[in-house]
Amino acid sequence: MGKHIIPQRRGHGSLVYRSPSHRHVVDVKHLKPGEYVVKDIIHAPGRNSPLLELVDSTGKKVYQIAFTGAYVGQKIVAGNVDTINPGTTTVLANIPDGSYVYNIESSPGDGGEFCRSAGTFALVVSHGSRVTLKLPSGSMRDFDPRCRATVGVVAASGIIDAPILKAGTHVHYLRSKAKRPYTVRGVAMNAVNHPHGGGNHQHVGRPSTVGRNAPPGRKVGRLSPKRRKVNGSK
């Protein structure tokens, strides 16, 4: 009897494949309208960008994704404001063209979905019935003017330039994101572990195309590929 393949194990949801959410600081959403002071800049497990630990007028702690240039003691404003500074959170209708923004809402009130990882930002291109932003991928996307965003660029833009140096460091980094630190090819496995495994040399040994409705244990290889057209055929 064969063993479950990796997608089946991941779908089962054991601790190996589950994100260690008990280590995460908080699920970062947009700030409520008001004034805040940066108390500290902290590391957040599972994220590649730091977080700002903020304090409001009542002394309550809240968190925000850090932006480039933030410092302890800095004052940050959220809501409808006249002056736009880095770290200000407001609706897109109030942010002028040419500004860099991050943590952009997809729909008003969802807390932010776009441009949240280290070094990312979007460019405000134009205003109208919809606000047009240029995303990091280069694509243009229209947003509701009531969607909120934070002015600035997400901090830690140089994270991809810093070498990891040690394999163990990379393992812990990926496990905090519930990702596997390595990948083993199916043809390199034994026949009991994968449909492509086994044999005297590494080869699939069968057609690698599988149907869209194949069961999970057999759904590996080229999934429901389109039919290849031959020259001269209709």
From Swiss-Prot:
Please list the GO terms describing molecular function: rRNA binding; structural constituent of ribosome
InterPro entries, A to Z: NA-bd_OB-fold (IPR012340), Rib_uL2_dom2 (IPR014722), Ribosomal_uL2 (IPR002171), Ribosomal_uL2_arc_euk (IPR023672), Ribosomal_uL2_C (IPR022669), Ribosomal_uL2_dom3 (IPR014726), Translation_prot_SH3-like_sf (IPR008991)
What GO biological process terms does the UniProt entry carry, in alphabetical order? Answer: cytoplasmic translation
Query: What Gene3D superfamilies does this protein's entry cite?
Result: 2.30.30.30, Nucleic acid-binding proteins, Ribosomal protein L2, domain 3
Quaternary structure, from the entry: Part of the 50S ribosomal subunit. Forms a bridge to the 30S subunit in the 70S ribosome.
Tell me, what does this protein do in biology?
One of the primary rRNA binding proteins. Required for association of the 30S and 50S subunits to form the 70S ribosome, for tRNA binding and peptide bond formation. It has been suggested to have peptidyltransferase activity; this is somewhat controversial. Makes several contacts with the 16S rRNA in the 70S ribosome.
* Family to which this protein belongs: Belongs to the universal ribosomal protein uL2 family.
Q: What is this protein called?
A: Large ribosomal subunit protein uL2
Recorded source organism is Thermoplasma volcanium (strain ATCC 51530 / DSM 4299 / JCM 9571 / NBRC 15438 / GSS1)
